[in-house]
Amino acid sequence: MKFKKDDKKKKVSEDKGTIVEYFYMIPAEVTVRDLVEAVHCVDEEAKEIWTELDLMEIVLSADSLIFENMMDTFTEPGDREFLAAKGVKVVYAASYNTNDKEMVKKVLEELHAAFGGFMASDTEDLEPIFEIADF
């Protein structure tokens, strides 16, 4: 009895990661220009800013790490109370591919060294909250 040889190549499943978003909450008035100047762990060519949008992009291996100013979206009284209680002056949405997590952590550590702050989840109550060291 002869078996047919399976000529079909098996597809290797490639982990493409997931895009996730958190809020980087900063206790200082900073702009994307300040953010980009504080990041040294990536090549200069990998960093780009759009000052008119208050947006920074850092090209990483799987995708880009993007910081976008989100202060205008925190308009509810509860939001403002939260920000005031935590001493937050600026909020940036930070979105990235989970496959880039190690490099994202390095970038966040550099930003934290320069400006302080913490990460909050993109949820209704902003929980859980992470210190940069635990992120």
Question: What spans do the regions from the language model cover?
Answer:
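Acidic, proline/glycine-rich low-complexity IDRs
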Residues: 1-22, 30-49, 95, 102-135
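Short, intrinsically disordered low-complexity segments
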Residues: 26-99
